[in-house]
């Protein structure tokens, strides 16, 4: 009889943060909105707050970067550690150290689903269907997968059953799709800059931006728009039709997450051949089931916000059963190891975090060491062949641990 590997138990869980409202601006890391000045991601981009003049020029003006990065580390009895990052900052540290720790410490490193279910159940009364608490749970879940992979000596994608393709191809999100094309990406997604409060003039301006990029990128390069919850159904429908002559591939997250009926109406009225996508700010499997029922074409969960890798795998299975695609919101290595195992994820997102989109910078820089970037718009599965998620924590980032237990 062959010996079965004895797995260690989890001895410690620890939580740090960097950046956020209590730190110097521009820390980056898991909260990739926390950038310095003159960065495209904090330019005049349409948001739900754009209707207020005091908050229309910059997303940081209304506090998009106040949370900062949460770092969760889990340590096994044998001294091996796993970690992950997300957007939850100091408040996430409190939740981990003062509440979730009881469900983690003392469990076997393979008890990921048990821990996940207990975290969801224990926070249900104050978590709702997403947000800060779900970000924190996601971060813990990812750290557990990282630890499990390191203990057994396998990359996370092999723990999920292995790759279904040799490489991942990417589109780039940023202000310069023309530069993304030169770098080998299959498409470029731009933020919109105007919203319903700008009326038809706003529609004309964003449509002109798409037209300009279509001329620069040629007829076949994918172009998409990210609307970041800033529109209503009528405005989004008019914008979609205004952009249809320029072969817009999809229009993304036009409405707030809870407006399921609005997404159903938008999908029904969108131009033929143009896809409607959303999901970045949805959390929990149940919310994605409701979103799937609207008939949108692509669901876009963020693995660091939706409940972690455990939930992302469930969302992908749900979408597959309905013939829908899952293309996660860009989350670097945490997405790479998942999507290379999904048959309904033919491409993925890479978020351009360099200020002017002219260079490739790792998304969670500087908090992750050895973080991958695409080469000619692609990442081959062979570069994922390191235990866990294949990255290490940069402990020179002035990590702060405000709580302990």
UniProtKB/Swiss-Prot annotation:
Biological process annotations from GO: amino acid catabolic process; carbohydrate catabolic process
In terms of superkingdom, the source organism counts as Bacteria
Question: Any keyword Transmembrane?
Answer: no
What remark does the entry make about the cofactor?
Answer: Binds 1 Mg(2+) ion per subunit.
Task: Please provide the record's keywords in A-Z order.
Answer: Lyase, Magnesium, Metal-binding
Q: Which cofactor does it need?
A: Mg(2+)
Quote additional remarks. Reaction proceeds via a syn dehydration.
Catalytic activity from the UniProt record: L-rhamnonate = 2-dehydro-3-deoxy-L-rhamnonate + H2O
Instruction: Report what the protein is called.
Output: L-rhamnonate dehydratase
- Pfam families associated with the record: MR_MLE_C (PF13378), MR_MLE_N (PF02746)
Q: Which family does it belong to?
A: Belongs to the mandelate racemase/muconate lactonizing enzyme family. RhamD subfamily.
- The residues the record assigns to binding Mg(2+) are 226, 252, 280
**NCBIfam families given in the database record:** PRK15440.1
Provide the site residues for: Transition state stabilizer: 349
Alphabetical list of PROSITE patterns matching this protein: MR_MLE_1
State its Enzyme Commission number(s): 4.2.1.90
The record, for SMART domains, names: MR_MLE (SM00922)
Q: According to its UniProt record, which residues of this chain constitute the active site?
A: 329
Q: How does it assemble?
A: Homooctamer; tetramer of dimers.
The encoding gene is rhmD
Annotated residues that bind substrate are located at: 33, 59, 349
Q: What InterPro entries does the record point to?
A: Enolase-like_C_sf, Enolase-like_N, Enolase_C-like, L-Rhamnon_dehydrat, Mandel_Rmase/mucon_lact_enz_CS, Mandelate_racemase_C, Mandelate_racemase_N_dom, RHMD-like
Functional summary from the UniProt entry: Catalyzes the dehydration of L-rhamnonate to 2-keto-3-deoxy-L-rhamnonate (KDR).
């Amino acid at each position: 009889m062959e010996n079965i590997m004895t797995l260690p138990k989890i001895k410690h869980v620890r939580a740090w943060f960097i950046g956020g409202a209590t730190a110097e601006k521009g820390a980056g890391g898991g909260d990739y909105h926390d950038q310095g000045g003159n960065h495209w991601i904090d330019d005049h981009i349409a948001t739900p707050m754009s209707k207020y003049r005091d908050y229309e020029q910059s997303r940081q003006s209304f506090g998009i970067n106040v949370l900062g990065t949460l770092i969760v580390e889990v340590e096994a009895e044998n001294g091996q550690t796993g970690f992950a990052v997300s957007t939850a900052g100091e408040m996430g540290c409190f939740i981990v150290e003062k509440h979730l720790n009881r469900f983690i410490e003392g469990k076997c490193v393979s008890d990921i689903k048990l821990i996940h279910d207990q975290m969801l159940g224990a926070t249900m009364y104050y978590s709702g269907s997403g947000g800060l608490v779900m970000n924190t749970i996601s971060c813990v879940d990812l750290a557990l997968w990282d630890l499990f992979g390191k203990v057994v000596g396998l990359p996370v994608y092999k723990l999920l059953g292995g790759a279904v393709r040799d490489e991942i191809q990417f589109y780039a999100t940023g202000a310069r799709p023309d530069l993304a094309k030169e770098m080998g990406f299959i498409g470029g997604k731009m933020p919109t800059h105007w919203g319903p409060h700008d009326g038809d003039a706003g529609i004309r301006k964003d449509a002109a931006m798409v037209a300009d990029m279509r001329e620069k990128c040629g007829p076949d390069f994918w172009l998409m728009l990210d609307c970041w919850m800033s529109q209503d159904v009528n405005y989004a429908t008019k914008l979609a039709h205004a952009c249809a002559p320029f072969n817009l591939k999809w229009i993304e997250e036009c409405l707030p997450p809870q407006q399921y009926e609005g997404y159903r109406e938008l999908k029904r009225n969108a131009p033929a051949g143009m896809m409607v996508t959303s999901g970045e700010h949805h959390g929990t499997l149940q919310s994605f089931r409701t979103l799937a029922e609207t008939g949108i074409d692509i669901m876009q969960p963020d693995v660091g916000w939706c409940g972690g890798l455990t939930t992302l795998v469930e969302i992908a299975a749900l979408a597959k059963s309905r013939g829908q695609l899952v293309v996660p919101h860009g989350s670097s290595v945490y997405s790479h190891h998942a999507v290379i195992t999904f048959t309904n994820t033919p491409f993925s997102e890479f978020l351009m975090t360099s200020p002017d989109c002219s260079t490739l910078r790792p998304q969670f820089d500087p908090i992750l060491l050895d973080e991958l970037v695409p080469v000619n718009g692609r990442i081959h599965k062979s570069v994922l062949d390191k235990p866990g998620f294949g990255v290490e924590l940069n402990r020179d980032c002035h990590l702060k641990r405000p709580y302990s237990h």
